[in-house]
C-alpha cells in the first residue's frame, strides 16, 4: 500500500494557506458560500493576457502558432466581432468546426469581449445544427467547410445570422465571409477594452441528450477558471503528500488534443490547461493512432487525456511502434470507466508514465474528482478524490445523506457549477436539491474519500424482479483480455421484464460460450448476458465522451433481429 507523507486534508491546509499561490477563501457566489482561489485570474481574457509568450502553443500539421500569435489573431477577430458584426456583451458567438487553430482563436476572441462562446458539436447533422442555432440564437457563427455545407441545408434559420467560414470555399446557398479576409481587415487592431466580471457568462456547451436535444450548459468565467486552477492544485497536493515527484524536463511540455474542442475535456482539460503551464497543444485533423504516435514523437508531447478507447489504442500500438514515445509522462482521462487491465498496462508501459482518470460533467465544467499514479494503480475502479473547491455527498431516494460504502446518488456543490440550462429554467430547478447539483450518477465513497461511480440511476436492468447494475456487468466483461469497451443494457422481455444485452468493442471476436463461462466465475447466474453483440470499432459516444447507452442498445436490437421489440 502506498505510504503518504501527509493526508490530502493536511496537504490542502499547507498548499492553500493564506499567502500561498493557491490560497483559498470563502466567497458568496450566486447567494451561496463557496471556496475560490484568491489569486485566480478574474476572467478568461485575463488568463490569455497573463500568459503571453513566444513559446509554441498550437501545432496543427505544418502550422505553428505561439501564445503571442494566438492572442494577436484573437485581437483582430475580436475587433471585427465588435465593429463589423455588432457583437456586444452577452451576445452569443457560435463555433462549429474540427479542431483547427481557428477554433481556439475564435473562442479567445468571443470570451475576451464579453460574448458567450457557444460550442456546437461538429458531428451534428444539419437538423441538429439548426436546432442548436434556434436554441442559442447566436449573432455570428464561425464554421469550416463541412459545417458550412450543413448550414446551407438548415431550414428556418434567422435572416440576421452572420457567418464566417474558414478553410472553406463559398457556398452558393448561404452568404459568408472568409476568415482570412476578416483578419486582414483588422491586422492593426488591438484587443477591444470591454469590462468583464468574473460572474459574467462565458460559455454554452451542450450536454449529451439521451432522449431529446442536448441541453445548453451556461457557465461563467469564474467557474471555468477555478476548475483550471483546481486541476493545477491537484498536482501540487500529490507532491505535498509525497506520492508524486515532479520531473524536470529540458524541453517544452505538450498535450495531445485527442478530444473535440466542443467537449469540456477538450476545451478546458486539454486546451486551456496549456496556458499557465505553457504547454504546446498537438492537434489532429481526426483521430488516427499512427498519426497520433508520430505527433507525440515529433513534438515530444508529455500528456494525453482521452477516453479509454483512445488511450488503449496508444498503449496497444505504442508497444510495437517504431515511434519514440519516451516523452510521455501522463496518460488517462475521464468520461467512462477504464478497464483495470488498461490502468495496469499504462503503469507497465514505462517507469516514467503515470495513469490518471477523473469524473466530472459539463455542468461542473469538467471538475469533480480525480486520481493519479499509484493511487490509481491501487484503486483502478475509483474515479478519485474530491476537488478542494467542491463538496460531494451521496444520498438515498429520500435525500438522506449516506455513510461510507453505501450506494446512492452523487451530489455536488461548489464554485465550478454551471449557472443553468440555457432557456430551460424548469430543467435547471429540477437539477438541484437546494445548492446541491443532482448528478444522476450512482456512486459510493469509501472510508478514505475515494469515489466509485457505479453507473447512472437510469442504467439499471430489472430482470425478473432483480435490480442489476450495468456497471457491475461491464466491469466483469472488461477483465477479459480481448475486450476494449463494454456497454450493458436491458432488452425488453415478455417473461422477465428485461433481459441483459451487451455490446462489446473487441480486439478479436470472442466465442460467446467461452465468454459466458468466463463471466460465470465473476457474476451471478442472473447477471450473465443473454444477448452479446461484438464490433471492431469504439462504441458510440456523446458530447461528454460518455457511451450513448440508449443508441448502442437500439442498434443492438436491430442487429439481433429483435426490431419488433418496443423500447421505451
Question: For the regions a protein language model found, what residue spans apply to each?
Answer:
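Conserved AMP-binding A3 loop
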Residues: 66-68, 202-230
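AMP-binding/adenylate-forming catalytic domain of the ANL superfamily
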Residues: 524-546, 563-568
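Conserved pre-ATP/AMP-binding loop-to-beta segment of ANL
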Residues: 187-206, 213, 247-254
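ANL superfamily adenylate-forming
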Residues: 22-25, 62, 149-198, 225, ...
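Gly/Ser/Thr-rich phosphate-binding loop
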Residues: 276-277, 301-305, 315-378, 391
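Conserved AMP-binding/adenylation subdomain of ANL enzymes
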Residues: 225-254, 258, 262-302, 317
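Conserved AMP-binding/adenylate-forming core of the ANL superfamily
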Residues: 36, 40, 54-88, 92-100, ...
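AMP-binding/adenylate-forming catalytic core of the ANL superfamily
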Residues: 124, 131, 141-143, 304, ...
